[in-house]
Amino acid sequence: MADNVPQIFDRKRLARNRTRAAGLTRNFGTHDFLLRHVGNELRDRIAGVARKFLTGLCLGSSGGIIEAMNSEQPDEGHIVTLYHADLSAYLVPDNGRGLVCDEERLPFAEASFDLVVALWGLHHVNDLPGALIQIRQILKPDGFFLA
């Protein structure tokens, strides 16, 4: 991220708010209609890609919706290994594939992922062009980005 980018959003406050909200809504129950809708849209879009994704990254909380969608996918559009990154530790799984990090400073090596999905987070990024550049860098040359 460039040093001269105006800091419109307070990223530390956003992390606190996401953690608080995650604690209040650990089990969405019948209130996950928006997540399910986004998951269905995501499933349809990824299913249209005629390939299997060996490594995927979900930026922002998915509430488990991507895992549910992925278990229903045939070979095309299937994500073999899915990693999660979020500002809040409460929103990343504790299965060894979750990382607490800021979308503005991605800690991944270049060409690490076949697929990057950004849910519920890029609208709060101060340097959107910088974040998109970083996402492009962590994608493999034929990688797929969906936001």
Protein language model features and the residues they cover:
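Short, functionally important structural connectors and interaction interfaces within domains
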Residues: 1, 6, 26, 79, ...
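Short catalytic micro-motifs in class I SAM-dependent methyltransferases
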Residues: 120-123
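Class I SAM-dependent methyltransferase Rossmann-like catalytic core
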Residues: 1-54
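A short glycine-rich, Lys/Arg-flanked "PGG" loop and its adjoining helix->strand segment in the class I
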Residues: 129-144
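Short conserved AdoMet
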Residues: 51, 126, 140
